[in-house]
């Protein structure tokens, strides 16, 4: 008879099942004694606040203060030493050590209750602040209660939860186990709050526009389609709020912004998620140059207020990284100039005609679509050869009109627009332009987009007749911009993939 062996996966599953069985038995015993999930404990302190306020107090000063606290949190570590134990509790603000002794608790409680609790259980504690012999701020427990019994164990302390997909699927576990993840999403919250404060202080009005639309618009992207049963019509999840926000500017709301969720039925990558968050804003009586100035001010303010410095360290996965300085003026280059800068063998004449630009693209092995104009080819060359080279904050201006259906044409060269995209760390972070407010030109460009869609371009825009009607009522000179919040948080937290900064990113369902 051959010897049977088990794989590590089987061993782990068996171990997990055994531990869960034991924890369920403990829960059953707790139920027999009363409600094991009480909801009458109220804390008055958070761990981080206690460290901030009392972290510099000496042992003698803490004794003199006699500070009584009520805290609650999850048991992350525990050391049982006979009649006394140390444990670490984790709450929303951090961690703090508690000191529990048998003699401070009701008779029998320490051995029959406390010692049988598990890592991951949530407890409420009352006690006095003190400093241990090793100098650690701690709570000497006078009362402790079990508030929630955890039926599943925490990840192993040293292995943690390191698998990228597992962290995304079980974000709750990732947040419990990984301090860096908690910091990332705390910074994300601060970024959103900082953006909102910045625009509110400049007298922008926050608004909400439809997330389900009859005609998707505002960006070149493939939309998600749904069906509205009551109206019996197909609708589209928003790919951008732009056309609705500009309708509001027509209506007299001259400075508007929306922190919005957009949906694009496209690929998933380290910097793309089908559902993502942006800040999009519009201001009347401004142009794209004003927006570039505003963007510099915004990013500089956010970095200083949230990170405490205008210089940040950023590294893509596997790379050494670089220091990005928001304190210096941002570089500004036209698209053509940037191509010439990073492609020394290319001349201005090479980008002057469709045929010569196609020859450059062919030499660079860039795939082109049928029916593309000169502007499309130049943009493709830029995206393939320049975009990833833009590491320090850089505005790329003068985007071709062929790829900018909503932007105002440049007064000097109508083949390009008063548009920019902002790049940092080799990635696009923002897109802004002086808005096209010529209704007749907009109607023509919409028709060009329809022609491109009929020729097979799934990402070309739909014709939005109502938006053209709105422009016919008069849109004041306006500039508008969108900034990707997910990518900005990636930058501020030195995250390598967009999934690390979205709490619940899109994932394929697991097979059972």
Swiss-Prot record:
Cofactor binding note from Swiss-Prot or TrEMBL: Binds 3 Mg(2+) ions per subunit.
User: Where does it reside?
Assistant: Cytoplasm
- GO cellular component terms, semicolon-separated: cytosol
Carries keyword Metal-binding?
yes
Stated EC number for the protein is: 6.1.1.6
**Principal EC category:** ligase
Mention one GO molecular function. Answer: lysine-tRNA ligase activity
Q: Which Gene3D superfamilies match?
A: Bira Bifunctional Protein, Domain 2, Nucleic acid-binding proteins
InterPro entries cross-referenced by the UniProt entry: Aa-tRNA-synt_II (IPR004364), aa-tRNA-synth_II (IPR006195), aa-tRNA-synth_II/BPL/LPL (IPR045864), Lys-tRNA-ligase_II (IPR002313), Lys-tRNA-ligase_II_bac/euk (IPR034762), Lys-tRNA-ligase_II_N (IPR044136), Lys-tRNA-synth_II_C (IPR018149), NA-bd_OB-fold (IPR012340)
* Annotated keywords: Aminoacyl-tRNA synthetase, ATP-binding, Cytoplasm, Ligase, Magnesium, Metal-binding, Nucleotide-binding, Protein biosynthesis
- Pfam families per UniProt: tRNA-synt_2, tRNA_anti-codon
Q: Which superkingdom? A: Bacteria
Picking any one GO biological process from the record gives: lysyl-tRNA aminoacylation
Names of required cofactors? Mg(2+)
Q: Which reactions is this enzyme annotated as catalysing?
A: tRNA(Lys) + L-lysine + ATP = L-lysyl-tRNA(Lys) + AMP + diphosphate
Q: Where does Mg(2+) 2 bind?
A: 428
Name the PROSITE patterns for this protein: AA_TRNA_LIGASE_II
Q: Which residues bind Mg(2+) 1?
A: 421, 428
Describe its assembly. Answer: Homodimer.
What family, per the record?
A: Belongs to the class-II aminoacyl-tRNA synthetase family.
Q: What is this protein called?
A: Lysine--tRNA ligase
Gene transcribed to yield this protein: lysS
């Amino acid at each position: 008879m051959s010897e049977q062996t088990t794989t590590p996966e089987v061993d782990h599953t068996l171990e997990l099942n055994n531990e869960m069985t034991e924890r369920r038995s403990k829960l059953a015993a707790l139920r027999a004694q009363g409600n094991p999930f009480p909801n009458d404990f109220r804390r008055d302190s958070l761990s981080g606040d206690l460290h901030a306020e009392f972290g510099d107090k000496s042992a003698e000063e803490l004794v003199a203060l006699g500070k009584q606290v009520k805290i609650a949190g999850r048991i992350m570590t525990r050391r049982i030493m006979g009649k006394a134990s140390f444990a670490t509790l984790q709450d929303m603000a951090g961690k703090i050590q508690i000191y529990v002794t048998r003699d401070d608790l009701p008779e029998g409680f320490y051995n029959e209750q406390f010692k049988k609790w598990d890592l991951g259980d949530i407890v409420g504690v009352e006690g006095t602040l003190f400093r241990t012999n090793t100098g650690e701020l701690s709570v000497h427990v006078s009362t402790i209660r079990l508030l929630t019994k955890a039926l599943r164990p925490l990840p192993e302390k040293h292995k943690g939860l390191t698998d990228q997909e597992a962290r995304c699927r079980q974000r709750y576990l990732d947040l419990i186990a990984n301090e860096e993840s908690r910091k990332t999403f705390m910074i994300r919250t601060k970024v959103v709050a900082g953006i909102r404060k910045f625009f509110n202080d400049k007298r922008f009005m926050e608004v909400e526009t439809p997330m389900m639309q009859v005609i998707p618009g505002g960006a070149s992207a493939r939309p998600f389609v749904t069906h509205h049963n009551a109206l019996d019509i197909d609708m589209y999840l928003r790919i951008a709020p732009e056309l609705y926000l500009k309708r509001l500017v027509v209506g007299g709301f001259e400075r508007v912004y929306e922190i919005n969720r957009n949906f694009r039925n496209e690929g998933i990558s380290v910097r793309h998620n089908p559902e993502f968050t942006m800040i999009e804003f519009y201001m009347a009586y401004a142009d794209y140059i004003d927006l570039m100035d505003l963007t510099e001010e915004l990013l500089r303010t956010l970095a200083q207020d949230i990170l405490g410095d205008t210089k940040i360290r950023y590294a893509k996965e596997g790379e050494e990284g670089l220091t990005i300085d928001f304190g210096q003026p941002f570089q500004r280059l036209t698209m053509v100039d940037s191509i010439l800068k990073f492609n020394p063998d290319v001349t201005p004449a090479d980008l002057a005609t469709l045929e010569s630009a196609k020859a450059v693209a062919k030499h660079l092995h860039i795939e082109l679509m049928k029916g593309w104009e000169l502007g499309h080819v130049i943009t493709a060359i830029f995206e393939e050869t320049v975009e990833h080279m833009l590491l320090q904050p850089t505005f790329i201006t003068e985007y071709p009109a062929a790829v900018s259906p909503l932007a105002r044409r440049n007064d000097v060269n109508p083949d390009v627009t008063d548009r920019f995209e902002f790049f940092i760390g080799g990635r696009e972070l923002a897109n802004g332009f002086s808005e096209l407010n010529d209704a007749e030109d907009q109607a023509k460009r919409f028709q060009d987009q329809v022609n491109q869609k009929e020729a097979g371009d799934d990402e070309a825009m739909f014709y939005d007749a109502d938006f053209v009607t709105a422009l016919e009522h008069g849109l004041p000179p306006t500039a508008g911009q969108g900034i990707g919040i997910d990518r900005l948080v990636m930058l501020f937290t030195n995250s390598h993939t967009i999934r690390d900064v979205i709490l619940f990113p899109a994932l394929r369902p697991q097979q059972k």
